[in-house]
Amino acid sequence: MAPKKKEDKDAPPPEDTNPYGVFVSVTMPSATVVLDVQDDAAAQRETHITLNIPGCHVPWASAHTAPSEGGVYQYSVVKHFRRSGGQDGLLQLINGVLTVTVNDSATNAVLASATVDQLQGFAIGQNTWSTEGLDLVPAAEVPEGVPKARSARLAFASIALQERPLPEGADAAALAAAPPPPEAELPPLLPYSYVSGEAAEKGNMVELVVSGLSPLPPNLQAAADAAGGKLHVTVGLALPGGGPAVAVSLAVAGGRVAAPAFRRELLPPGCLQALQYALEDGLPVVLEVARYVSAEGMADPAFEGYHAAAAAPALAAGLGAAGATEAAAEGLSLTAWAASGAKTCLPPYTAPAGKPKPVEAEVPPAGTCLWEKAGAQLAVSLRFARPVVPAWRPPPPPPRPLLELIPPRDLTPKPPPTTAVDEFKAKVRVIARALAEEYKAVLPPPDASVAAAAAGGGAEGRHKALIFELNRSGKYAQMRDSLKTAVVSLVREKYRKSGSMSPNEMALLYNDLYGSLLAAVHSSLNDLVDAAAARPRAPPPAPVPDKQRLGELLELAAQAEAMGDTDRAELLHQRRLLAKNDAQVWYEYGTYCLRRGGAKRGRAEECFREALALEPAHRGALLALLGCSVAAGRNTDPAYLESAEAAAHRLLDVAGRSSLDAWAALAVVYRAYGEAKRAELASCEQEMARLEKQQLAAAAAAASAGVSPSPSYGEGRAGGNGGGVPATEPSTASAGSVAGSAGELQARSFISLANTLLESLALPAEAALALELAAGLRHWPSVGPDTRTLHALAGALAEQALARAAGGGAASAAAEAMLTPGSSVLSMMRADAGEAVSSVAAEAAWRCRLLVAQLHKARGATDEAIRFYQSFIAITQQHAPSTPPPPPPPPPPPPPPPPQEYIEAARSSGRLAEVPLSAWLELAEAYAARGQARFAADVFLLGASARPGCAVLWRGAGRCFVGAEELGPADMALSEANVLDPEDPEAWGWLALVALREGRAEDAEKALAFGLRCGLGDPGLLLDIAAEYRAAGQRRAEQRVLQEVAVKLMPESCSARLLLARCLVAQRCGAEAAEAVAAARQLAAHEDDEAAVAELEAELRGMA
């Protein structure tokens, strides 16, 4: 027996013929190959296609095929390459390429080839690729006797990742060992993916390409030769933010590294968010270079000398741009790895066991970088299958733009409609001008002598001649006919149809018509005379209030609203609406309706729509309509959110695409939509981050150049175009922002929007929504303390407003919770106790004192409320500029209680004008509730010194002086209030009361008359006036006042009817008194009332 041949260890393993598993299917039906041949016989040479994909040990070859007409080879290639599953199989495929060659079948020489690098799509869930037409590159050299290919082109090529699952219950090992059945008997191949659905949707793939690394250190090639070629240089990259490391191994041969070379790795969805944030924040990208020896028995003592780092900021900058997938960096210098301080991603060097031979005899000193000494430079590129930082997609436009929902109104004045009288007057003017020209034509020349002028009968003769000529020429008839037509039109317009009328009635009609026509003729002739004399008539006064009066009415309305007099505030706003073409007037009335709440919310939206119809670019109205629509969409009908979206897009167009505030408003709208608009919200946040980075860079550049930031740095802060959006204070908007961290400007934009929604528009829930977005920013943990303080203050104010809106015990419960020791409100209030306190913290502490006072008032703790109100006012002196104090109003107050020392200190402060009107009113009300009218008057006077034009403060001071029985100061304060607001009915009423107590009955009568005419409706004040009349014995005047109270103001009050009845009884007016007593009998609700009624009835019977 012949001995068995020794098996060839290098022989490739046989092809895997298992018909079940994962397959890469390649389809190539035909190709057109043009050969460079001289005769037809050579043109019929057979060729075949070979395919080689990662994992193939031997390229697969198709059947030999002869060409058909036109050099078309019908290869009909459909080849299924079985590959292993799992991540190892996927990494093998994506790090390789499909190689296609057209070979000469006789010699197997390569005629043309192509490389298809499309297997990488399998990493992100793509399982098919195809192309119509694939050009192959002809081979430059072929063996002798083999024709060259001039061109080669595949008609079609496709790659598909498929799977044929095992039959249920089948034995995988037995099926793999058995001969494969025919293809027709096998189950069909199904689409397959190496990655899960989530990874296919959100995963990514990274590719690191090393383009070059040169020059090499001098001893590197010698070390590679000593290691027998088993030495390689590895370039690795640890992606910022986490994720797998990417390492490319480069062989060393011929004095250079084998480049370019690449390596691809999978990026799971879990690490992409951190990678995105790292690229957006510009975290450094550091490449690591190291040398490894894999030869057995050899060590590398110079490992640290070849261990280097290369910083690549261009990679981070390029890939940090939105939508970028690839970035390259060239000329990267290498330095010692130990000096870089970066975290290594390549495996550490481990010396082999035993006594290995060093691959390089010379060991460099510690800290030496041989790459740096050689001047080596690295060139790499980094590519992702999908953008790590998503491409910014602008939010889609709203279904209907706002200009379509609210079309702009044409304010061009329209000419008044013409009437028959106007046409008649126009005819008269035309005829008058024509007659004037005729008369002018017959007049003698100016330089004619008296005899010449008297010739022909003089003026009378010329007049007769003119009449004759007008009749002869027919001009008179034309004038008469034209007037006749106008008169007929006038009669038809004015008298319609006369019907059957008597001669007397017709005579009256003719007389009226004649009078009308004569008046029209005189009016027309007078207009002609006035125009000729250049003395036009003065236009009638405009019925619309001017700007100054509109401002005065707005201030008075705000004062009435602060006092709780909503009826008068509504009346004053309605008077301002006489300026119906002023968008700002409609906007301010809409904000008032929003603050009123309830049924007024619908009217507020109508006002904002009217303002936008008048002025489509009114930013305040746009933001107000946005807020109203968001509130309605969240609480009632989500369809309102479409209107809010349209308003937000319009605001973005008006404010400019670089306005952070406008983008913040749009983000609030998308946040109100919820998950339905999550992608749009992310788009807004992405654009805001880009704008912030741009503005911070511009501000930093300006600061480094010693130039103040341009206005665009704070663009969008002010309301503009009609106001309505208050500008953020410099201390809260831009101070420290340049040096601040990322996210600072974005957070400030949301906080500014929240303040506007809260304070100007009374929309606390929507303000809380904006604050949620601020706290949800990615960089919120790193924002500065001032921004956090502003956010906490706005949140506390929103919480307080929501509790007030809830009503009932919610306000008291919220006050208790906010006043808990350690709460954010108390912490902010005490934040100004140190020495180095920022202006923002000081402002917040001052504002929190007022908030704490209001919270104590809400929970019924009057004493505590007074203490913090006084503290709020007192702190104004600590931060006030040194300005001379206003003169204190007379008279000087008596010694105050202990807390009053703060008011005395604040009196000389120039910042008292910043104290809101509500604080003065609430503090005075707290004193009045304790029965300390004199101290309440002091508060009113101090407030009036800070706001000398505020009528309600003077009126409050006068009222408190009346309560303290100081009539002189009361009269002075009330007179000042009356001058500032002559239409305030309560000021007139209190003036009447003071006059009565001082014995000035005539002045009291006039003041009371004016007060009643202006709508005096305070029953208590009127009853006090009636009591003064009673004390003075003026029963008739008392009766008038009591009738006003009993009939108009308190028609359901039994006591008012009884007072009126007693007054009438005192005047012996039995019948009227009986009616009043009868009405009181019907209104009597308890025994005391019935007893009083019975007493009066008995008295009336005694009168009878």
Swiss-Prot record:
Bilayer-crossing regions: none
Annotated GO biological process: cilium movement
Region (Disordered): 1-20, 400-419, 706-737, 878-900
Biased composition (Gly residues): 716-725
Biased composition (Pro residues): 882-900
Cellular component, GO, one term: cilium
Localization: Cytoplasm, Cytoskeleton, Cilium axoneme; Cell projection, Cilium
Alphabetical list of InterPro entries matching this protein: CFAP70, TPR-like_helical_dom_sf
Keywords, alphabetical: Cell projection, Cytoplasm, Cytoskeleton, Repeat, TPR repeat
Keyword Cytoplasm: yes
Function, in words: Axoneme-binding protein that acts as a regulatory component of the outer dynein arm and regulates ciliary motility.
UniProt-recorded name of the protein: Cilia- and flagella-associated protein 70
